[in-house]
């Protein structure tokens, strides 16, 4: 029984890691914030541009201090000038002039259906399975959760707890 419980616990932890896709992004600095209006993005499939060079990255980072530049960069993210999209790890995008993000790829999930807005407090949207919050250091923390594997994780955890309690009661 103890071996089974140990395996169940390992499986639960592994499932939790998978459910979060191992993806926790931290964006430092000033975010592009819009009016909060939802805009529908036109067009079909778009190719994702290549990441900028180190020189472009440094220039982009330095030029955004006053919020007037069309480029922005941090240690894990960059915003391509002229591309109208914010890219972070190739998995998220943000149209110019809004604070709406997408999960599931750079060209999927149109604005207004599976969107969430970053702000000064925690925000979660069940459609896009995205959670964000902004801490005191002006960092926006972005976490993507796979709801299917998350539910599976919760079931495994509940099973582990029930087995542990049952085994403890049998001793008495």
From Swiss-Prot:
Transmembrane segments: 141-161
Entry keyword set: Glycoprotein, Membrane, Signal, Transmembrane, Transmembrane helix
Region (Disordered): 27-69
Residues carrying sugar: 135, 138
UniProt biased composition (Low complexity): 53-69
Signal peptide: 1-22
Cytoplasmic compartment spans: 162-172
Membrane topology: Single-pass type I membrane protein
Full protein name: Uncharacterized transmembrane protein DDB_G0291364
Organism: Dictyostelium discoideum
């Amino acid at each position: 029984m103890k071996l089974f419980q140990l395996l169940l616990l390992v499986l639960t932890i592994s499932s939790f890691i998978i459910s979060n896709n191992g993806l926790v992004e931290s964006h430092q600095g000033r975010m592009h914030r819009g009016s909060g209006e939802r805009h529908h993005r036109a067009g079909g499939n778009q190719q994702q541009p290549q990441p900028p060079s180190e020189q472009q990255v440094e220039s982009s980072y330095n030029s955004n201090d006053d919020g007037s530049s069309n480029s922005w960069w941090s240690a894990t993210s960059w915003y391509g000038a002229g591309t109208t999209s914010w890219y972070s790890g190739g998995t998220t995008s943000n149209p110019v002039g809004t604070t709406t993000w997408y999960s599931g790829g750079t060209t999927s999930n149109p604005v207004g259906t599976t969107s969430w807005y970053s702000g000064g407090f925690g925000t979660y949207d069940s459609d896009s399975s995205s959670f964000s919050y902004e801490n005191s250091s002006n960092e926006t923390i972005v976490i993507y959760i796979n709801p299917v594997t998350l539910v599976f994780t919760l079931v495994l955890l509940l099973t582990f707890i029930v087995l542990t309690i049952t085994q403890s009661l049998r001793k008495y």
